[in-house]
Amino acid sequence: MDAPSIFTRKKVAYACATLCCLLWGSSYPAIKSGYELFQIATDDVPSKIVFAGYRFLFAGALLLLFALAQRKPIARLNSRQCGQLAILGVTQTSIQYIFFYVGLAFTTGVKGSIMNATGTFFSVLLAHFIYQNDRLSYNKAVGCILGFAGVMLVNVNHSLSDFSFVWQGDGFVVLAAFILSAATLYGKRISQTVDPTVMTGWQLAFGGLVLVGGGYLTGGTLAVHSAAAALVLAYLTLLSSIAFALWSVLLKHNRVSMIAPFNFVVPVAGTVLSAIFLGENILELKYAVALALVHRDLVGK
């Protein structure tokens, strides 16, 4: 009988989940810097999709090379598993990001951040109906509400006074969050028969390739104008490979409702790190309260 994985230990799982979300949070300022360095206009969605596609394509390739270095059989997949990985790549990476980027083009960053946080609710609710050992409880519901409140508080400003709902903007971001949640649960099932690193590598590479092709076909372009631009893309590639692979391992060995709420850390971490690296203002009481709410959500799971 195999020994329990180290990732089943709560302290290890929590530390790794926090690391993943801090890495994803750091992508906020990195992506903003990337748009400037690659000279991508704010409304140039196709070029943004190309940029994201290369990020995931390279991240997937990096993970597959890492799996090869560990002597894991990256090509020993049957036709059913290949189909599953293709579906996972198209949904979790391609379709999800297309809806996300198109949605952001028709809504504000504030509303987009809040709407995207609904993904945690979807993950917990879907897990409730799929897994018998992952039912929704009072504490989980309260924790999700507190975490969502923290995300909303980070985004409190005058723009919230007119919080209308636009389907092509806000609706697309919510739809992207739902697709990501559903695809993540699908990935959890695949990881029971395919190594998580191999699974993540193939889905990122395939999904990224679809994004690159789709971005170019719709008029997107991408040119490296400086070494700094290449370094930013390299960092985004590295953080994606580490965070997505580690997240897949965590979901394989733990309940979804135990890991998913850490996603509330991402927008808060993104705000804090943007303030540090992009010089944005963070010396406001709302940020401290938001961090406290998110922390209360995580320790109360």
What are these regions (language model features)?
Residues 1-50, 90, 162-189, 209, ...:
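Glycine-/small-residue-enriched transmembrane alpha-helix faces in small-molecule transporters
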Residues 9-14, 44-47, 77-83, 156-179, ...:
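Juxtamembrane helix-entry segments on the extracytoplasmic side of multipass membrane proteins
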Residues 34, 51, 103, 129-136, ...:
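Hydrophobic/aromatic residues within transmembrane alpha-helices
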Residues 37-92, 122-126, 179-183, 200-218, ...:
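Transmembrane alpha-helices of multi-pass small-molecule transport proteins
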Residues 50-52, 57, 61, 91-92, ...:
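Specific alpha-helical transmembrane segments that line the substrate/conduction pathway
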Residues 54, 93, 111-118, 185-209, ...:
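Helix-helix packing/entry segments at the starts of transmembrane helices
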Residues 63, 125-126, 138-157, 264, ...:
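Hydrophobic transmembrane alpha-helices of multi-pass small-molecule transport proteins
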Residues 68-112, 116, 153, 236-254:
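Specific transmembrane alpha-helical segments of multi-pass solute transporters/efflux pumps
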